[in-house]
Amino acid sequence: MADCGGENVVMEETMRTETDEIRDNLKYLTLLSRDYPSQAAAASDIISTQALLKLPKGTEHFMSDLHGENEAFVHILNSASGVIREKVDQVLGDTVPKHTRAELATLIYYPNEKLPQLKARCTSEEALDQWYTETLLRLIDICRLVSSKHTRDHVRRCLPASCGYILDELLHAHFEDHDKDLYYGQIVGSIIENGRADRFIVRLCELIKHLAVDKLHIVGDLFDRGPRPDIILDLLMRHHNVDIQWGNHDVVWMGAAAGNPICICTVLKTTLAYHNHGMLEDCYGINLRHLQRMAEQFYGNDDLSIWMPHTDAARGPYTRGMLHRCAVMHKAISILMFKLECHVIDRNPDFQMQERDYLRRIDWEKHTVKIGEKEYPLRDTSFPTVDPADPAALHPDEQLVLRKLVQSFRQSEKLQQHVEFLYAKGSVYHIENGNLLYHGAVPMTSRGTFAMERFEGRYYSGRALMDYCDARARRGYYAPEGSAARQSGQDFLWYLWCGKLSPLFGRSAMTTFERLYVEDASTHTEVKDPYYTWYNDEAVCRRILAEFGLPGASHIVNGHVPVREKNGESPIKGGGRLVVIDGGFCRAYHEKTGIAGYTLVYSSRTMSLRTHQPFESAEKAVKDNLDIISQKNILETENHRILVEDTDEGEVLRERVHDLKQLVAAYQLGWITETRCEDHIW
């Protein structure tokens, strides 16, 4: 009897504790009751959520360093780094020839481009109908496989309104008491007969790609020298589930969109150096007319050999006039940029970049520049807008050009949309499902400890430094116009681009001036942060993970630095704790690395690294059914299939179930009045 009494006391205390918690949360639960006005509504969601927890984890796709290379990005996005082809092979196997499976995979990647080619091979109406039937049935089977990780409700929400009901029937029909072939045959036959086959094929292909990857992670550098970063951002804005970790090329564009003059000059210098300014003018509507006029006025007759843009034969041809126009603007904007760098360095002594004000270190009589303790001859000695007595002072014409450029960047509606998206979906780092994602580095000392940096009177290191960088970067865009906080944030966006201890840059200096003006290659060296030595050490990687609250079995996903595979370098560091996935999209790096980079796929069963070969063109990929996956390396295989309940999303869902159970209890206690519905079973 005594034991039973003790159990009753424990039960009463437990009930009191649960009741107290409900009472404490009553204000929140009352708000929650607006969405779930009855016990029936809350209980229904509890049941569906608990079922969702038992589904397999969705596939995550990691990409990095896109560098504006839109065609390669689109191909890897469409193919999900080989996931789509794996699903095609899994469903069709050896029953369908390899070349037919390759064609079907290409159709899924590029339905609008591939469909006309495949139809053109059909020599009769009967042959076309037969091809339609085979293709639709195969696509339905593949779509059923990729939808198996999702609830039926989720799949329905992904279906296009115009044909959603029919696709739902095709994907979820049951055949216990009727003939599957007869049922499918009737629906598919009707689709073909009514001239809707093309539309259904395209919709199925898009649905397969949507369902095959649950989450896309972009680990930085959407912008750089590639031709169309705007296309990449347009696609990402339409993606169903994406996050972004800013790279140094991204933050400088974010600063430019905020109207920061030094960031504007920096992005212009990069685009002009690679003859990509057409994208600025045509896609973002940036007016370069005033810059071109000033450039011709002051530099039109100069020797522009060191200012000629890097060109890509695949994007040519280029006329002499085109190259001259680009080179003269390249020189004008570079000198303006070097002047503005002096201003930013003066305003921010805590950046510790005082040695980078090179215009002040030029001997105007000897035509040399002092770098460190040595003097070097200048490759170009024409500085008509520079006053030797005050080299950083802006010429009146430069001031006018700068005002017009700031106005143009601020008024570019598309650029503002893209940068707002980068802020909304982006951050300096991201943690999800046991993976720590960041673009560049966690700055370290030569001894392998976290580097301590002082900003605005306080010291930061490790995670605190990354959090500080994120917060100050947001000031540059969102702080009130004209405020000191906004100016400080914009200066910091430039620091994140090239600062010696920037976690997004990870090098001692951005040697832009030296590469342009100094012949001696020893001055061009950009010393990597000690992080890039220490990340080979497993203990250091585990310490980084611990700094961010993750257990040692977690992973770091890093971008930024191309892996020179042809020299034997491995993308797997720190005993498998860190993976470098620089996407290698930038064509300039292919000769150095021997490959076109890596992507990462994390499914419910494995984490795998995908190695890519250089991508020629979308046209060739469509025509010849080319893919660029050359190798798949399994990094980890799970002992059991990872379920939604094992993920970060699962934790959120369990909290929702807990809250809904409390709401049901509050209804039962009479503390919240429910709105009863006619049709319920509770």
Locations of the language-model features?
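Feature recognizes metal-dependent phosphohydrolase scaffolds
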Residues: 2-682
